[in-house]
Amino acid sequence: MKRLIVYFHYDPLGQIDTACRVAVEAMAHYGEVFFISNGTLRPADRAWAASVTLTCRERENKGLDVGAYKEALAVIGRGRLARYDELVLMNFTLAGPVCSLASMFAAMEARPELAFWGLTRHYAMKSRRFGGRSGEVPEHLQSHFLAVRAPLLHSEDFWQYWQKMPLPKSYEESIANHETRFTAHFANLGCRWDSYVDTKDLRDVFVNPIMACPRELLANRGCPFFKRRSFFTPYADELRRTDGTAARTLYDYVKQETNYPVDLLLAALLQRQPLEMLARELHWQYVLPDAAPVEPAPELAAQGLALLHLPISEVEKADSVTAWYTREAARRADEALAQAAALFAKEPMLGVLSPAVPLWSAARQSRDADWQAARPALQGKVNVPLGQNPPPAPACGWALVRLAAVAGSDTLPAITAPEDAWLLPLKAQQNGFFSASFTTAAQSAAAADQLALHYQQAADPKAVAKQFGRLVKHKLKK
């Protein structure tokens, strides 16, 4: 089967990261690749794309993936496309493959009755955001990987679909006008379709299996790709549809059970996503055993580490309970220094580590307030995006730092102002390192019990009303 692959790429820095390169090189074994990027590539990246693909085209960042596909088809032309038996439209939001693609292409080539097929499907749901005027999202193949075959590929219907397609101005318009429409549009014309990954048994469980249970799809259903967005999707959205562990179990599986360079993907994401989003999805928090014997203080300098004590902020001091818990957390952290230092040997990408924020609610509120106060001064000092919420470290006036992550030498950057402490995790992120916190087993158990209590109270109207009353009373006192 002669196959053409249109690979859509976008990166605000003009880079083609490792995840894109691995995907393109793997797909190039199964067809000719037309690489199209919404933006200007760096010279080295442009040279790489030109060396491994049939065509490399750069365009204005307009119309998202739909705009790129539409332009690619116009450039290729109907006559040239007539030479191919199958067209694959694929975009950079997929990472992988974690296994050979031979099984997928062989399985789908054995199904000549299909006019088009895709990697995965999304099940029907109601959505004002993505459902357009009707608010209904039908079951559909997901647009991150769509394969269209002759004779549909060469038909007037296919070309009219793209010629009449308006350029979307937003992600929501792209989903509503193309992804959720493509499958139904051609199915209504009598075309047969299917997804390679079989998730029919999950129809009543998850509407979007590749995001909700990616490890299951990779480990047990032969899916060769996963979504890079798994590692930075808003965590509140995850909790509305899953138990919140999908990203971490995906990461552990890919790292431990495959040869895919997932840490290189993570390093690229650290340059482009807020640290706190990655930290929440990947649960960069370690639990140290309570009963572990106190070990001698490690030789930190020999490990390329440094211990940094930071003063308690004025906001933390304002609440006496917060100040007490913060001082206690710092004191206990000193006792666990050897265990904390050992984590750096285990995790080569770990840059900054600190005790977890105390479970006392005012402590977290104080830390959030400190971050918001420091955030304006941090803008422009680092070349990574700043999230609305603080990174996991530093906290509790204590941080263990990998010198190479924050300084690139054997000296620490000077800390002369409160915002300088926040620069530690941000500089580490800029250099490709993540930050994390550690907690005791007792704190971890207490956090689980607190969560259970919050769920219980959230389901009780009386408890909600009581909490609302307390909040109003507290605000009035201020």
Name what the model sees in each region.
Residues M1-K478:
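ER/Golgi luminal nucleotide-sugar-dependent glycosyltransferases, focusing on the catalytic module
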